[in-house]
Each structure stands twice: as C-alpha cells, then as structure tokens.
Amino acid sequence: MKRAIIIGATSGIGEEVAKLLIQQGWHIGIAGRREEALEKLQATAPGQIEIQRLDVTDPDAPTLLETLIRKLGGMDLFFLSSGIGSQNPDLKPEIELNTARTNVEGFTRMVTAAFNHFKNEGGGHIAVISSIAGTKGLGIAPAYSATKRFQNT
C-alpha cells in the first residue's frame, strides 16, 4: 500500500493531488488549517484518508506531522503544497512577514521534519510546490518571489 502525506490539502494544487492519489489507490494523510475542508475531502473516500489540522507556522507542526504519519501507518511520499502570496504594492510589512513565515519558516520546518523521518526510516520521497516567481520574480509581490527563490534553491 502506498502512503502519502499532503500538507496544504484544503484547496488548490494540494487538494487536487489528494484527489488524484485517491483515484490511484493511495492511502493518504491530509493536513491544513481548515478542518472542515479536510473533513469534506475525507468523506469522499472513507477508510482511505486520515486528517490532521496543522498550521506550518506553528512550532508544533512537526509533532503533528508525526501524529499523522502514525495514523496513516507510515509515509512513502511527503507532498508540501502549503504557501501564501499577496500583491503588496505599498510594501506593508505584515504582508511580507506573513509570507516569509509561511513560505520560508513553515517550508523549512516541514521539509526538515519529513527529511528526518525518511532518514530514520531508510528512504522516501519529498515533493514541494514552488513557483516560477522564484526564478523570474514579481515586482508587485516581493516577499512571494523571494520565498519561492528560497524554496527553489
């Protein structure tokens, strides 16, 4: 049985990847901030999906990841699709700082936790969603571009 954990599965690419993996017979653990959205997706494939409310910006997120891995019975693939980005023409500091917290701090926290899990277990796969903005840059969203560059490095 193949097992994947998807962080950021409450919408967008993460949600769609979850649906595709379910169709392919994977057992998945899904995590995100919106528990109602997690439960809605879980209801589409009873017995195939475990859920965990998790915010990558919280220091306890790696512990919650390990909880989800235990619920699932292991992890073969870690898929990170959490991230934020906003246009910020006035360079409001809070927008830039929130983007950095999620896309750098949260990214680092979760990928490091997944890496350490796989290192201890003898292997696995890590996949993350980034953006062309990390190589091309978007002047209207400076923190988004910078954080995606960080993820691409």
What do the predicted segments below correspond to?
Residues T10-S11:
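Conserved glycine-rich cofactor-binding loop
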Residues A45-D60:
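Rossmann-fold cofactor-recognition segment
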Residues S81-Q87:
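Conserved NAD(P)H cofactor-binding loop of Rossmann-fold oxidoreductase domains
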Residues P89-R101:
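Short alpha-helical oligomerization interface
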Residues V111, T147:
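Active-site helix of classical SDR
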Residues S131:
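Residue(s) in the substrate-gating loop at a strand-loop-helix junction
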Residues K136-P142:
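Active-site loop immediately N-terminal to the catalytic Tyr-X3-Lys motif
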